[in-house]
Amino acid sequence: MAGCRGSLCCCCRWCCCCGERETRTPEELTILGETQEEEDEILPRKDYESLDYDRCINDPYLEVLETMDHKKGRWYEVVKWTVVFAIGVCTGLVGLFVDFFVQLFTQLKFGVVEASVEECSQKGCLALSLLELLGFNLTFVFLASLLVLIEPVAAGSGIPEIKCYLNGVKVPGIVRLRTLLCKVFGVLFSVAGGLFVGKEGPMIHSGAVVGAGLPQFQSISLRKIQFNFPYFRSDRDKRDFVSAGAAAGIAAAFGAPIGATLFSLEEGSSFWNQGLTWKVLFCSMSATFTLNFFRSGIQFGSWGSFQLPGLLNFGEFKCSDSDKKCHLWTAMDMGFFVVMGVIGGLLGATFNCLNKRLAKYRMRNVHPKPKLVRVLESLLVSLVTTLVVFVASMVLGECRQMSSSSQISNGSLKLQVTSDVNSSIKAFFCPNDTYNDMATLFFNPQESAILQLFHQDGTFSPITLALFFVLYFLLACWTYGISVPSGLFVPSLLCGAAFGRLVANVLKSYIGLSHIYSGTFSLIGAAALLGGVVRMTISLTVILIESTNEITYGLPIMITLMVAKWTGDFFNKGIYDIHVGLRGVPLLEWETEVEMDKLRASDIMEPNLTYVYPHTRIQSLVSILRTTVHHAFPVVTENRGNEKEFMKGNQLISNNIKFKKSSILTRAGEQRRRSQSMKSYPSSELRNVCDEHVASEEPAEKEDLLQQMLERRYTPYPNLYPDQSPSEDWTMEERFRPLTFHGLILRSQLVTLLVRGVCYSESQSSASQPRLSYAEMAEDYPRFPDIHDLDLTLLNPRMIVDVTPYMNPSPFTVSPNTHVSQVFNLFRTMGLRHLPVVNAVGEIVGIVTRHNLTYEFLQARLRQHYQTI
């Protein structure tokens, strides 16, 4: 076991060992993933740690409940709602910060380059303009890539990682303050650097980090930031705040608080309740109105007007008053929308397939090399993107006549769109009174380009739209996955909007459907491609409706997204699920396949257990913790017929056997307890039965054998009984002897007990053992001490630890005959980390963990099942 690299929080021994792999940090493994040389598919890694979403109702927790009166309960709720509001406000301010500096850097870059292009168009020095554009873009991308080297998990959008976190997987470094700083600064440099990425996706990750860190009032990265805030010191509470923060991020990005709430439910959170719904919606509203308030005041000088609800504004869709035949959409258009949904699904599947191949190539050929290679790859993508943008605008663009409402302003043309939002059109390389349609799309911020496609009628030729779509599609696919913070929402929307606008132009010019509204088709195209890539339906429908502020678009958007999802699902998964799979994360889907019910809990559990006794010596606990990597241990006692002989003279064995007897509940014993509590007594016969069961036992002496087993590098388990000394010649019955199950205790709890000296001497009773409060047990959360950092010289190895007050005495359990679908539903819906399998007489026979419920593991077990039939 010393060579094991990690485990999926399970209590099995053999399944946690890994082969030798190259040395990488947990953060690098998280973002880079691992590949298998012989197999093309990437299986879930077993060294991911799960989160404790199940509440541990032990003695310290019950003591808290005893002191929790109505007033404290109300105060706790007030604090929780206040924290939720603060998360929303802070997420909105993060969005404001990113948007402000992205606009600042983008305006600086385009201002310098446009002035140079205007001057060099006449002097013939366009190469100088290209060098200036390259200088800006390469510098910004270089800074973004350096930030990812500082914190590798800051790369990408962060949505796959947050999805895994909310699913119950502990992703290293995903919600650190350092990750937030690298993400925020990195994404503004990525967008300002001209890469085909968006800032809206990383807002979800940023909001999640704010939600995770703000309620803790401390930081792992900056350890001096600590206020000893006593609340919300558990994974269960943090999960709810991360859900709220992620929703606040997308609400700030799109100005869609209801859609953001649904997004957190549909794509993110695996565990949900009614109270969380209100808190997530309130947090989303807080983020939306915070961002709206400050953006409206800064941009328009109209504080309190609330004119800009999100980072991405789609504007108002309406037909011209002079065009009486125009309609936003008609029933006849639904057929075109369905076809566009099919094409969007095909394009999305193609995008995902290409990006998956690129990601695998990077994992095999880029990531194993020195970190500088990842920076060079990012610079290469930036270089190619800049060259394509500049050359395409100069060579492939068409000079089109300005409309009468257009006017020249500082080398660009200002055009008032129907949504009352000013968007600039570019006159690059074109004579007076004309503009370059390709440059208008490439030399504008992506949000402005989307507005151009949504609201400008007849300003782009079909050839320009087709070329722009192909170039943007390929470059966006290549860009997603490089070592910079990047989002995928806006690139997918812009690429899809060009596709929809192309369809509208073809229908108008070549089929003669003059009544159609081009903006509607552009919106449907954007929805089709985005839905084909990310495969979301409900939340994306509401987000787009809220962004357009047009409820009549609800039906066509929903149908388009459904068709795009069905079409794409026929070929592959959504882009986020693909990247989750590439990282080997044991993500649990919503449900298992029907055929998995051919398996039972006994088929998938791990029977080879590492366990502890209710009373165990420090020497044994330290050895177990240092020689295994499991994150929880069953608390058990052994079933023997001659227990009285072994109790003589040994306090440790006596305490364990007494605990076992006291934990056995009988109907007669319960009736006696109830009768005594009512000042009445049962019959003498019933008393005799109970007295016989709880008869006192005499203790005996016994030798601790754990150190001998540890020296032999073989630890089946420290056996307390002298007639069964550890031996490699044990029979199967001896190795898997019956064990009565009493509860579960976590590794973090055991280490905390050892660090704080919670133990008692063999010459004393267990009542003399110091007691820890709930606050003391959770004080080191979320970074509990490591057993290897423990100073063993401060511990007496012969002292005994009573773990019973701190274990979870009533975890969820299943019987060996429980069908896999029932095991899966219980594990997933209750947010479990470990699921003991207990037989009909209360003996633990195995443990089910997250790894045992992954699709790949179940498929392997199903194949074995078919082979044994």
Curated annotation (Swiss-Prot):
GO terms for molecular function: antiporter activity; ATP binding; voltage-gated chloride channel activity. Glycans are attached at N410, N422, N432. It is a multi-pass membrane protein. Residues 605-662, 807-868 form the CBS domain. InterPro entries: CBS_dom (IPR000644), CBS_dom_sf (IPR046342), Cl-channel/antiporter (IPR051280), Cl-channel_core (IPR014743), Cl_channel-6 (IPR002248), ClC (IPR001807). Coiled coil: none annotated. Chloride binds at S157, F489, Y576. A motif (Selectivity filter part_2) lies at residues 198-202. A motif (Selectivity filter part_1) lies at residues 156-160. GO terms for biological process: chloride transport. Keywords: Antiport, ATP-binding, CBS domain, Chloride, Endosome, Glycoprotein, Ion transport, Membrane, Nucleotide-binding, Phosphoprotein, Repeat, Transmembrane, Transmembrane helix, Transport. The record marks E200 as: Mediates proton transfer from the outer aqueous phase to the interior of the protein. N-glycosylated on several asparagine residues. GO terms for cellular component: late endosome membrane; lysosomal membrane. Residues 668-687 are annotated as: Disordered. Residues 1-80, 572-869 are cytoplasmic. Residues 159-166, 241-253, 257-265, 519-533, 534-536, 537-548, 549-552 dip into the membrane without crossing it. The modification Phosphoserine is found at S773. Residues 677-686 have a biased composition (Polar residues). Its main location: membrane. A motif (Selectivity filter part_3) lies at residues 487-491. ATP binds at H630, H631, A632, T849, R850, H851, N852. The chain crosses the membrane at residues 81-113, 128-150, 176-194, 200-217, 277-294, 335-364, 371-392, 462-481, 487-511, 553-571. Voltage-gated channel mediating the exchange of chloride ions against protons. Functions as antiporter and contributes to the acidification of the late endosome lumen. The CLC channel family contains both chloride channels and proton-coupled anion transporters that exchange chloride or another anion for protons. The presence of conserved gating glutamate residues is typical for family members that function as antiporters. Belongs to the chloride channel (TC 2.A.49) family. ClC-6/CLCN6 subfamily. This is H(+)/Cl(-) exchange transporter 6. The gene is CLCN6.
